[in-house]
Amino acid sequence: MVQGVFVTGPPGVGKTTLIVKVTSRLKERGIRIVGFYTVEEREGGVRVGFRLVNVSNGEWRWLAHVNKVQGPMVGKYHVDVNSIEWGLTLLNQEGDLYVIDEVGPMEMKHPSFLRRVEDVVNSRRFLITIHVKMSNWVNSHLNLGSLIRLSYVNRDAAVDEVLNYLRTILNMA
């Protein structure tokens, strides 16, 4: 049974922007949303890190940064595994929709991350973005969610497409 929506696409195509737009519109309708999304941080036009943001209240932690001195490396970034743990604890809250942005190489540095994502996918209504490098994982879970492949061509229309899927899943009129 389909319980949610997976969104994938190349870096920079607008997966997080879609998450922010969709969750904003659902919150206006009284849907309780829990989880997190990831935003990049730039200084002087250069990406220096990523923040993990609580979708409920905007509170955030550093997911990864070029100037951190500890943590496993993904590219030029040191990943803060404690921040990933913080993000995972957000999924323990009660909600109507569980948001995870994203399932990707940085998040996979946490030893329990993928297991926790699978718990959500198997038992909750969800909206999850998937890094293109994780396509094998999402393909094995397509029986539980609809898949939107985001591109520069469809990214604006995809907001309404995702909302339509979620309205059905959430039993909204």
From Swiss-Prot:
Q: Which reaction does it catalyse?
A: a ribonucleoside 5'-triphosphate + H2O = a ribonucleoside 5'-diphosphate + phosphate + H(+)
Q: What residues does ATP bind to?
A: 9-16, 97-104
Keywords on record: ATP-binding, Hydrolase, Nucleotide-binding
Which InterPro entries does its entry note?
Nuc-triphosphatase_THEP1, P-loop_NTPase
Q: Where is the signal peptide?
A: none
Q: What class of enzyme is it?
A: hydrolase
* Gene Ontology molecular function, alphabetical: ATP binding; ribonucleoside triphosphate phosphatase activity
Could you say which EC number(s) this protein's record lists? 3.6.1.15
Q: Name one Pfam family in it.
A: NTPase_1
Q: Please name the Gene3D superfamilies in this protein's record.
A: P-loop containing nucleotide triphosphate hydrolases (3.40.50.300)
HAMAP family attached here? NTPase_1
Matching PANTHER family? CANCER-RELATED NUCLEOSIDE-TRIPHOSPHATASE
Give the similarity note: Belongs to the THEP1 NTPase family.
Q: What does this protein do?
A: Has nucleotide phosphatase activity towards ATP, GTP, CTP, TTP and UTP. May hydrolyze nucleoside diphosphates with lower efficiency.
* The protein's name in its UniProt record: Nucleoside-triphosphatase THEP1
| Species for this entry | Caldivirga maquilingensis (strain ATCC 700844 / DSM 13496 / JCM 10307 / IC-167)
Q: Lineage of the native species? A: Archaea, Thermoproteota, Thermoprotei, Thermoproteales, Thermoproteaceae
